[in-house]
Amino acid sequence: MAKATDAPLITELQLANWHISHPEIAEFLDSRDVQDQWESAIKDQGSRGRVLVCERDLALVGVAAIEFEGQLGQLSLLEVTPTCRRQLIGSRLLNAVADIAGRAGASSIYSWVATADTPAQEFLESTGFTHTGATRTIGFQDGASELLSDQMHMSTNLDNRA
């Protein structure tokens, strides 16, 4: 599980990855606000969710966050440092999240994935997630700027995971 001292590193990893995969969102994010949210999430770990990290050679290389809503677990974040991808870090984090969710009473895990984020979709599909058909657009329009992100809903049943 993540420690309070991990919040700045999680923020750095998330923002660096989002500048690559979600630049339209990343440009609007304030690093201090993101770090505050991670500090709060780490402090509040327990029955409502967990934040997991993966370290290699004392460096944070992956993070996953799960939130519980009754029998549902929401995978709210799964990020791996680009230079460490395809080394099973994401798979291990996702398996740990599934174990934690199952022990917390969840029967399935879902995630909202940007429709343009094909690598994330393919990764989740390779681990048993399927598209549910649900979509959403999130963001804001304030006259001066616009941020809209089209997302698709993906889920997996924990009973069917190997």
Predicted regions and their residues:
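Conserved acetyl-CoA binding element of GNAT-fold acetyltransferases
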Residues: 71-82, 91, 112
